[in-house]
Amino acid sequence: MGQLTVEAAAGRRGLREFVDHPYRKYRGDPVWVPPLRVSQLDLLDEGKNPLWRHARRTLYLARRDGRVVGRVAYIEDDEHMRVHDERIAFFGFFEADDEQVAGALLDVVEAHARSAGMLAVRGPINGTMN
């Protein structure tokens, strides 16, 4: 197996890679019913999804030899922290079917949360306000 890296998804290309990953991963799987790509893009669009009025996200992609092999979103929701009086972060949009990839993605989320002063991480969530 090649070298595994995890990095923030940058720009429109990174967003597209983040959204497209499960479509490539599960292509040909007869039991996978894919959501509409446009609905997934809208969930992550800071101008369309009202969640992002009071929350921030960082999208991470795991790559092995340059190929996307996993993804996760790190999310901080200011409204949740205010209402519930707790300093927690969330993770969502998690895709990994390899233990090493899963561990690397969750390690990045945990490190991000610690650096932001969060006391815990909760998830997975799907990027809606519910």
Briefly describe each language-model feature range:
Residues L61, R67-E76:
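Conserved beta-strand in the GNAT
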Residues R82-N130:
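Acyl-donor binding region in acyl/amide transferases
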Residues D45-R64:
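A short helix-loop-beta-strand connector motif used in the catalytic cores of GNAT acetyltransferases and
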Residues M1-G47, F90:
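Short amphipathic alpha-helix that is part of the acyltransferase structural core
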Residues G2, A55-T58, G70:
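Short beta-strand or tight-loop elements
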Residues K48, I75-E79:
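Alpha-helical subdomain
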